[in-house]
Amino acid sequence: REAVRIVREGGADILMKGIINTDNLLHAILDKEKGLLPKGKVLTHLAVMQIPTYNKLLFFSDAAVIPRPTLQQRIEMIWYAIHTCRSFGIEQPRISLIHCTEKVSAKFPHSLDYVNIVELAEAGEFGNVIIDGPLDVRTSCEQASGSIKGIVSPIDGQADVLIFPNIESGNTFYKSVSLFANADMAGLLQGPVCPVVLPSRSDSGLSKYYSMAMACLTCK
């Protein structure tokens, strides 16, 4: 709470979790009177990784905060991703809405949300971005996969951002790619008045360093 107070009073621009329980920090951030989350803002998590076999940075959300995002929360997640991509110099981010298949089905309510989001994007709601889905991870990030499946998408296997349907898939992706693909990672909480670095206990020192660098890039 003392660190949150310092940020609120202008004494710091970035908040980083140390050796404390994550819940304690989140409670301080979410405090309605003395916290850091403005009224009406959504608290979520955005990560970015550099994978040796991918030709660009890859952002993704949410691997840490929202169990099952609502449509409005997904829209906010996309806006956070857009603003962060612009901080990294990506003027027209390609955002892929992730599912296990490219088919829309009422059995998977998030796929219905995706249809609404794509329609908003096509109407210009998000500005200069490319959004498509549902798509699976491989079709989102590998051009040949879409060609083999006969899937035509403006993402064209060159996604900058992956929006996952729930925290289980996002978190599994986060840990799998860092473990098996030797990816370098960084991540921040999105929504508070300042960047919040929330490292996992198993994150490497380099990952924490990259997260601090990401916070500096996105700092207002």
List each language-model region with its residue ranges:
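Anion-binding alpha/beta catalytic cores of soluble intermediary-metabolism enzymes, centered on
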Residues: 1-155, 160-220
